[in-house]
């Protein structure tokens, strides 16, 4: 039996969706890279694709989906209970290394999502 995962996008408190915004810009500027990244996100639904060359662990629970085109296109994500993948940040860069500030943005968004997710669960428990 193949284990499938749901892929979700992080949203800010204000309702902005940075990964969707990143993908929308990519669709206009580099349609081929956009198509490859969207196909990669779809492949992440299959557990067998959670490793290289499509995906790579970065530490602290974060992973990257990577597409090499004119520039390296990366989407950072993490696992969540219930077979969920949460995509938190997307970047394009020329180098192989991930800039520290981009990793920090991805980590902050992951921690923000986790904080809000667990606060919501606590609200439901207290209502029971």
Predicted regions and their residues:
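Basic, Lys/Arg-enriched alpha-helical interface segments
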Residues: 1-72, 81-85, 92-128
């Amino acid at each position: 039996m193949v284990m499938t995962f749901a892929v979700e996008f992080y949203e800010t408190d204000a309702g902005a969706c940075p990964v969707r915004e990143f993908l929308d810009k990519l669709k206009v500027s580099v349609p081929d890279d956009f198509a490859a990244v969207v196909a990669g996100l779809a492949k992440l639904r299959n557990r067998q694709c959670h490793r290289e060359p499509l995906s790579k662990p970065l530490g602290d629970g974060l992973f990257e989906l990577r597409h090499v085109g004119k520039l390296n296109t990366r989407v950072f994500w993490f696992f969540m209970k219930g077979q969920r993948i949460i995509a938190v940040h997307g970047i394009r860069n020329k180098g192989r290394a991930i800039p520290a500030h981009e990793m920090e943005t991805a980590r902050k968004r992951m921690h923000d999502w986790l904080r809000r997710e667990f606060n919501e669960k606590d609200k439901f428990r207290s209502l029971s």
